[in-house]
Structures are given as structure tokens and as C-alpha cells.
């Protein structure tokens, strides 16, 4: 019996007690929905397989003492099929012990779940176990990473890539249609600074400083070896196309008010670098994402909002709703009407659009585009965007939508890469960039994705490169993957020994260690549902670590494949030890049941790792 089935049984009993007049003043309307009646796993196995606090939840509404209300619940539960024992404990907890056959039914449930048919979307051989449709009918637009195209993806963006894709997979496993979207910021001042930085690098490489060209990176520009590399690529591409950058620079070069060179190439050459370098960065970012197993459905270019008139259209929409006004020569969004702490400029007094104007148009586009309009627009933003939440939610409300429902904003905290016990700086401007490709080259995709997805994005996170590269149980991804590989090895050994679980009697899974594994398997569906509802995919990783620990412990105390005298563990002259080891061998029926349990664990680990975008290895 699964935890969900127990919750449904408890809910049914509550309604029956109301009908029978055994629940005091309680009415059907006061009974919470089933998902609010979840059972818990007792810390002490002596207290049973599951525990419910429903009597304490409902006692006040019923006008009864918790223990007095718990008694009729316990009596009804004790009569249900699959339940071996029920006890009322403490202030009103109801402890439930399942019979072994009922507890073990989860094994059949896991292995009988249908295989996923969209195999091209999965890394592992996964099945439907754990999946549900409670988010069915919803289209969720999940925007993540969206780093500026002014350099390679740094470690902060890498965290969002791992978390965002894992979240998308978890949401899809709960029935939602998810549109993965990357917002490509190819409009605005940061692109201008990027182009200036490239021009300076090009001028320095071509010894144009003496001619009056600026070769120093602008103080607000971008530094790093990648700037020099891209500048050289732009120059080579331009020359191949017959474009003379030096001639363009000479054409641009002007004088300041004192008749001296400006020291900086201007519009023409800078535009040449911009139009060639931005697509180069776009291609590099796309490749990095693909190599990291993140496949976006939409690559949205900010420039298109202006080119297609979407910014003007969105502002007109807000104006028609009475939320736009003019002041001091500028155009403002009256966001204070919708809970923001101050009104926001959207068109400056010089006629230029403020950055927020694009945000307004982008949200409106997500909600009303022809293909896959979003029921919910989820933004995954860095810690430096915390101040944006108020204005974004106000804009959502101004469009007649519900903040927190139609728009959700998730803020991620910082990531530090540790070197010699100290954080490595990660600023693109400092030239000391830790990129997604750097991380993958050191620890691999599996370790990078798992480690970043297993940490709560609401908290700062330190990456220990040495730990992630290690093959020890201290490395979480290794620990979980090893559990899967170990289960595969059990299968291979069982095949050699001629053991099959065909017709296995799962009621023989009656030891304490068996029970712990069974309970862990039964919790996977609720973990998956909670991870989706809470937007916290790290809960899947933490569950996998608990399942792996439970499995490793079970493996060490409950033998699956009989050990023979020829096995390495029983070789040697110690006849007493060999006899003891052989005595531990399970009888064939129990071995078959344990083999089936082994394969159920294997399946759930494969399912869980797939949700994190991590492979489930056959061998390690």
C-alpha cells in the first residue's frame, strides 16, 4: 500500500466517521483534501511503517481531544486490507504497520509501470513510475540562464542551466507542458560595451595605439582571453569578406574639442564588431548548452521586441488600461497602483526605451504568442535581480493577471568555485571567468549537473572541484550512480546463478532492511509531486541520496545472490568463516523476492537521475 493510498483511505474514513456521528462537530466541509492528509515515515521503525496526525489536525474542528478522535480512526484503519497493526501514540499520532505483502506491493507497482515512449528525451531506460498528471492542461514557460551574449556562460548561469532543466523535467513528469526558453539580450548598452571591448582588443593586436586608437579596455568593458579570441575571429571573418576594419576605423576616427584624437573608434567599426561578434557568442552559448544536455525550445532575441513593434504594442496595452502617464518629458508606468514601491520610467526624456520596457513587452508576448502561450511565466533570475520582483509583479497585475499564479519569479543565490580553500572570482570583467565548459572539462557533465541541481538554489553554494572529480562515497553523484551500477551487477550475478524473480513471493520481503527499502520506494511519487509544486528539483536529488543509502545498507545485510565457495569473499583457509558466509545464503524463494526488489530500486534510481539530466551507468 502506497502513502498516497493510505492518505485516500484516511480521508475516506474521516468522511465515514462524520456520517456515523463519531467525529463530534466535524463536517465533510471541514475535512482537508487528500493531499493535505499525507502520512509520514516514523523515525523509529518500532512505531510502524507510517504515521498520521489527522486526529490532531481535526480535533479542534471536531471539538474533541486528539486521542479521543484518534481511537475511531485507528479502529477503522485496523479493519482495512493490507494493514497488520494500528496504534494510537502520544498526543494522538496514529502509527500504522502494513502487512509484508501490502508493503511489498510497491515493487510490482514500480516494475509494472509502462516504459516511456519518448525515448529521445531521456538519458536512461525510464518508466512511468512516480509520474502523474496533476499539472496537466497547463503550459508553463520556463525562462532560465538568459545570460548576456557578452561572454561565455559563467558558473552562475551554469547553476541555472542545471536547475532549470531539472525543473523542466520534473514539471513535465507532473503532466505540465513546459516551454524551455532562453532570452538572448542582444539589445542595449551591454552590447555596446562588448563591442567597445572588442575594438580595443583588435586595436591593441594591430598596434594602432600610436595612431590614436584606444587599446585599453574601457573601464566598464569586458576583459579576458575570450575577448582577444573573438576580436581575432571577427578580424579574420571581416578580411575573408573583404571588409577593411582599419579603413572603417580611420573613417570613424574624430577629434575632441581640443583637436586631439578621440582615442576610440566609433560607430562604423564598432557596429562591424557587434554584428559579427554577437552571433559568434550566440553559437558558442548554444553549443555549451547542448553539450550540457540542455535543449531550449525557444531562443528569444530581445532585438525582435523592438523590430517587430512589440514594445510599442505592450505600452499601448497598458495605456489603454490607464497605467501609463507622462512626466518630466518621460513616459512612466504607474506601477505603484499595483503594489510596487515607486513608478517606473519606460521611455526616457531623450526618447530611448528604458530596459523595463522590453520586460513589459516580453511578458505580454509570452502570455499571448500564437504558439504555446503561457498559462504561467516562470522567471529564474540571479540574486542581483531581487529588486526587479516588485515592478515585474506590478506589471503582471496591470495586465489583469495574477502575480504568483500567472507570473512566478525564482531568485537563485551565488555559486563559488573553491580553489585552495578560497573562492575564485567569476566576473567577466575581471578576466578570471569560470565557465560552464571549464567546469565540465574538470568534473564532467554528470557531476556538474547533479551537484548544481542537488543544492537549494535559494542558498549560496560552494563547489569543491576535487570532491566532484573523486570516485568516493563522499561524492553525492558517485554515491547515487554507484547504487544503480551495483544493482546492475546483482542482475548479472543472478543470471549466472540462474536466479529469476518470475513468480516471486514478495511477502518474503519481511526483514527490517527490506521494509526500509520498500518504504523509500513508496515515497518517490510524493517527492516528485512536491518537487514540482514547490519548484524545488533538488528534492529529487536528496531523495535519491536517501534511497541509495538505504539500498547500500540493505545490500550489505541482505544477500540476494547465494555465495559459493568459489566466490572471492569465501576463498582462503578459514573454513569456519566460509561456512558462516554460506549459511547467510538466502533460500531460492527469498533470493527471487530480493532480486525483484533490487530491480525496483534500480528503476527508481534511473527514473530519478533522468529527471536531473544525469546518466544511470551499467558499470562503474
From Swiss-Prot:
Transmembrane segments: none annotated. One of its GO terms (cellular component) is cytoplasm. Pfam families: Arg_tRNA_synt_N, DALR_1, tRNA-synt_1d. PROSITE patterns: AA_TRNA_LIGASE_I (PS00178). Its EC number is 6.1.1.19. SMART domains: Arg_tRNA_synt_N, DALR_1. Keywords: Aminoacyl-tRNA synthetase, ATP-binding, Cytoplasm, Ligase, Nucleotide-binding, Protein biosynthesis. It is found in: Cytoplasm. InterPro entries: aa-tRNA-synth_I_CS, Arg-tRNA-ligase, Arg-tRNA-synth_N, Arg-tRNA-synth_N_sf, ArgRS_core, DALR_anticod-bd, Rossmann-like_a/b/a_fold, tRNAsynth_Ia_anticodon-bd. Gene3D superfamilies: Arginyl tRNA synthetase N-terminal domain, HUPs, Isoleucyl-tRNA Synthetase, Domain 1. SUPFAM superfamilies: Anticodon-binding domain of a subclass of class I aminoacyl-tRNA synthetases, Arginyl-tRNA synthetase (ArgRS), N-terminal 'additional' domain, Nucleotidylyl transferase. It catalyses: tRNA(Arg) + L-arginine + ATP = L-arginyl-tRNA(Arg) + AMP + diphosphate. One of its GO terms (molecular function) is ATP binding. PANTHER family: ARGININE--TRNA LIGASE, CYTOPLASMIC, ARGINYL-TRNA SYNTHETASE. Belongs to the class-I aminoacyl-tRNA synthetase family. This is Arginine--tRNA ligase.
Amino acid at each position: 500500500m502506497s502513502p498516497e493510498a493510505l492518505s485516500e483511505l484516511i480521508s475516506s474514513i474521516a468522511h465515514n466517521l462524520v456520517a456515523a456521528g463519531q467525529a463530534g462537530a466535524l463536517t465533510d466541509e471541514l475535512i482537508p483534501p487528500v493531499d493535505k492528509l499525507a502520512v509520514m515515515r516514523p523515525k523509529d521503525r518500532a512505531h510502524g511503517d507510517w504515521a498520521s496526525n489527522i486526529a490532531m489536525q481535526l480535533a479542534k474542528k471536531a471539538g474533541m481531544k486528539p486521542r479521543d478522535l484518534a481511537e475511531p480512526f485507528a479502529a477503522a484503519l485496523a479493519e482495512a486490507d493490507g494493514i497488520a497493526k494500528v496504534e494510537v501514540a502520544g498526543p494522538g499520532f496514529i502509527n500504522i504497520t502494513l502487512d509484508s505483502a501490502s508493503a511489498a506491493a510497491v515493487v510490482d507497482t514500480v516494475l509494472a509501470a509502462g516504459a516511456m515512449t519518448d525515448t529521445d528525451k531521456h538519458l536512461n531506460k525510464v518508466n512511468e513510475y512516480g509520474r502523474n498528471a496533476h499539472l496537466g492542461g497547463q503550459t508553463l514557460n520556463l525562462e532560465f540562464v538568459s545570460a548576456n551574449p557578452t561572454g561565455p556562460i559563467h558558473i552562475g548561469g551554469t547553476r541555472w542551466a542545471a536547475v532549470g532543466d531539472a525543473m523542466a523535467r520534473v514539471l513535465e513528469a507532473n503532466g505540465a507542458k513546459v516551454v524551455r526558453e532562453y532570452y538572448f539580450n542582444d539589445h542595449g548598452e551591454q552590447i555596446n560595451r562588448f563591442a567597445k571591448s572588442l575594438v580595443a582588443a583588435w586595436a591593441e593586436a594591430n598596434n594602432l595605439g600610436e595612431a590614436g586608437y584606444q587599446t585599453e579596455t574601457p573601464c566598464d568593458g569586458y576583459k579576458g582571453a575570450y575577448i582577444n579570441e573573438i576580436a581575432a575571429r571577427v578580424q579574420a571573418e571581416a578580411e575573408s569578406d573583404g571588409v577593411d576594419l582599419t579603413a572603417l576605423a580611420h573613417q570613424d576616427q574624430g577629434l575632441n574639442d581640443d583637436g586631439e584624437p578621440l582615442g576610440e573608434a566609433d560607430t562604423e567599426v564598432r557596429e562591424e564588431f557587434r554584428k559579427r561578434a554577437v552571433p559568434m557568442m550566440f553559437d558558442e552559448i548554444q553549443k555549451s548548452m547542448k553539450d550540457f544536455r540542455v535543449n531550449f525550445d525557444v531562443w528569444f532575441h530581445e532585438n525582435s521586441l523592438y523590430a517587430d513593434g512589440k514594445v510599442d504594442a505592450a505600452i499601448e496595452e497598458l495605456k489603454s488600461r490607464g497605467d501609463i502617464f507622462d512626466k518630466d518629458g518621460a513616459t512612466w508606468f504607474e506601477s505603484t497602483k499595483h503594489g510596487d514601491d515607486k513608478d517606473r520610467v519606460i521611455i526616457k526624456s531623450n526618447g530611448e526605451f528604458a530596459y523595463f520596457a522590453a520586460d513589459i513587452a516580453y511578458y505580454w508576448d509570452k502570455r499571448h504568442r500564437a504558439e504555446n502561450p503561457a498559462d504561467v511565466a516562470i522567471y529564474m533570475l540571479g540574486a542581483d535581480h531581487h529588486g526587479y520582483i516588485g515592478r515585474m509583479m506590478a506589471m503582471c497585475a496591470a495586465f489583469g493577471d495574477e502575480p504568483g499564479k500567472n507570473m512566478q519569479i525564482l531568485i537563485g543565490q551565488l555559486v563559488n568555485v573553491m580553489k585552495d580553500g578560497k573562492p575564485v572570482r567569476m566576473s567577466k570583467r575581471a578576466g578570471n571567468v569560470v565557465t560552464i565548459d571549464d567546469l565540465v572539462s574538470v568534473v564532467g557533465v554528470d557531476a556538474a549537473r547533479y551537484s548544481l541541481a542537488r543544492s537549494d538554489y535559494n542558498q549560496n553554494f560552494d563547489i569543491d572541484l576535487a570532491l566532484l572529480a573523486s570516485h568516493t562515497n563522499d561524492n553525492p553523484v558517485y554515491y547515487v550512480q554507484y547504487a544503480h551500477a551495483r544493482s546492475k551487477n546483482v542482475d548479472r550475478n543472478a543470471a549466472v546463478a540462474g536466479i529469476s524473480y518470475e513468480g516471486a513471493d514478495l511477502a518474503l520481503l519481511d526483514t527490517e532492511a527490506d521494509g526500509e527499502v520498500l518504504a523509500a520506494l513508496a515515497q518517490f511519487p510524493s517527492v516528485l509531486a512536491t518537487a514540482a509544486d514547490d519548484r524545488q528539483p533538488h528534492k529529487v536529488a536528496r531523495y535519491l541520496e536517501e534511497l541509495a543509502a538505504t539500498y547500500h545498507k540493505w545490500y550489505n545485510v541482505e544477500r540476494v545472490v547465494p555465495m559459493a565457495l568459489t566466490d572471492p569473499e569465501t576463498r582462503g583457509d578459514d573454513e569456519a568463516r566460509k561456512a558462516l558466509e554460506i549459511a547467510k545464503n538466502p533460500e531460492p524463494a527469498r533470493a527471487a523476492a530480493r532480486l525483484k526488489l533490487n530491480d525496483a530500486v534500480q528503476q527508481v534510481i534511473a527514473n530519478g537521475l533522468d529527471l536531473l539530466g544525469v546518466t544511470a551507468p551499467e558499470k562503474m
